[in-house]
Every structure is written in C-alpha cells, then in structure tokens.
C-alpha cells in the first residue's frame, strides 16, 4: 500500500501498528563509517524481508540507528532487532574485522498514527540534529 496510514491486511486481519526502534554501538563508540552504515541499511532490509516488518524511515549515524517501522501483530520486534544487528555486524566485520560491535538491547516505543508524521520527521532530521555523527566516507573506524 502506498499510504502508510491505511490499515494493512494479512490473512483476514486488519492492523495499523507502528514503532520507533533505536539501538547503539557498544559504549556509543562512533564506529559506523559510510560503508558500515550501508551494511546496516542492507541488513535492516534483509531483516524486514525475513520478519515481515516494513521500514517507513531510518537513519544510521556513527554510533546509533533509528528505524520507524510498521509491523504485523504477530511480529516480535526483538527478533527483528536481533537479526538486523547480527547481519549488519557480520557484513561490516567481513570488511574490517572487529569494526562493528553493538550494545546489548534496544529501545522501542509504539507510535499512534496521528504521531507518525512527527516521529518520521524526527528520524529524518537526525543528520541535522547530529552533524558530528554523520558516518564518514573514508577510513576505518575501529573499536578500541
């Protein structure tokens, strides 16, 4: 559906569920360079395909990730988060061993449809809010 405010349908169920998920690197180390950020974005896409979650907006910064999603009622967002983090770290660490390590856990809050535009705008504005955390295009940031 092109309108993410409409109800979604799945196996005789109608639903309208949204969440804002964030997770960060171990000790908030700014280890996500541009290549690792690309790995995170593709890992989130893979996790979405595997778990039935749909990304509405995301932002990958040097030390944390924001994702606004819609999801079915039978989805466990903890499974989505675990898969996205695992795939992202695996991909990034193939290029530079030990480059990306995530902190345990994540933050998630549900979003009412009336608040969805504001939350997606907040996530879209992350690079303006944190210009010092925009992933760099060159070099390999390694964790100490």
Regions found by a protein language model. Give the residues of each.
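Basic nucleic-acid-binding interfaces
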Residues: 1-144
